[in-house]
């Protein structure tokens, strides 16, 4: 689960955006600049990332759900892959407005998606060619839009976002509902309102892979710890069972 400073350096986490695009609120996390590019201070980024991992691990240990969000071209595949590995919901194509604030409607779409998949498995022979084509198109669209959250029965307990500026609607919805946010914040965005800020490059595929893998590892660690604790508790209960002593046996 642990990420090192060297790994962050190799992934280019320290490369911010051009100095002219900077957000002054990121000043505490900026080390300096080189060739008109801001350099993010990894001595700040590393402990803050570890803090975010700690939170994700604790949440997972308490059976909480973290929604992973990364819809930028270079993040899509990486986020989907790590979310699937960790067994958590994800959004990798586009954020639909109201995905959280209007979750009731989203749940209707999830039900429609599941019904259509069941219908497809049963066979579409009774449909005409045209109906089958329209059915396939609708299914494909639903799968693309909400496929990653089809097993999310309720609102998530936290959201992990790569690039808070690009996903400002997701961030705004989470804030409105009081859902804790873990966010990768580059030098051109504001860290305000993000509960667990990870100052770092939000464009490099290597950096994105490092964040997504790190959070997925933390979730899996938290779950594994929870299972171990339950096993220990069950074993302890078993050893404490009341044994009746036959006084006449002496």
From Swiss-Prot:
Gene Ontology BP annotations: translation
Single GO MF descriptor: structural constituent of ribosome
Keyword Ribosomal protein: yes
InterPro entries in the cross-refs: Ribosomal_uS2, Ribosomal_uS2_bac/mit/plastid, Ribosomal_uS2_CS, Ribosomal_uS2_flav_dom_sf
Domain of life per record: Bacteria
Record's keyword terms, sorted: Ribonucleoprotein, Ribosomal protein
GO cellular component: cytosolic small ribosomal subunit
Pfam family, one: Ribosomal_S2
Family per similarity comment: Belongs to the universal ribosomal protein uS2 family.
UniProt name for this protein: Small ribosomal subunit protein uS2
Organism name: Acidovorax ebreus (strain TPSY)
Gene: rpsB
């Amino acid at each position: 689960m642990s990420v090192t400073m060297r790994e962050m350096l190799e992934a280019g986490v320290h490369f911010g955006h051009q100095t002219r695009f900077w957000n002054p609120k990121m000043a505490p996390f900026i080390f300096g600049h080189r060739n008109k590019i801001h350099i993010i201070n990894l001595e700040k980024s590393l402990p803050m990332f570890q803090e975010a991992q700690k939170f994700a691990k604790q949440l997972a240990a308490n059976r909480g759900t973290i929604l992973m969000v990364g819809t930028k071209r270079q993040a899509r595949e990486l986020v989907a892959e790590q979310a699937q590995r960790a067994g958590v919901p994800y959004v990798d194509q586009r954020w639909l407005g109201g995905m959280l604030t209007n979750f009731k409607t989203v749940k209707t779409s999830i039900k429609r998606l599941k019904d259509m998949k069941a219908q497809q498995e049963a066979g579409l022979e009774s449909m005409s060619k045209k109906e089958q084509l329209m059915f396939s198109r609708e299914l494909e669209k639903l799968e693309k839009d909400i496929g990653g959250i089809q097993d999310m029965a309720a609102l998530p307990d936290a959201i992990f976002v790569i690039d808070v500026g690009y996903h400002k609607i997701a961030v705004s919805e989470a804030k409105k509902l009081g859902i804790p946010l873990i966010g990768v914040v580059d030098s051109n965005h504001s860290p305000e309102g993000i509960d667990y800020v990870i100052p770092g490059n939000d464009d490099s595929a290597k950096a994105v892979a490092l964040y997504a893998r790190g959070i997925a590892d933390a979730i899996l660690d938290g779950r594994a710890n929870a299972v171990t604790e339950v096993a220990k508790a069950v074993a302890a209960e078993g050893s404490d069972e009341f044994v009746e002593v036959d006084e006449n046996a002496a």
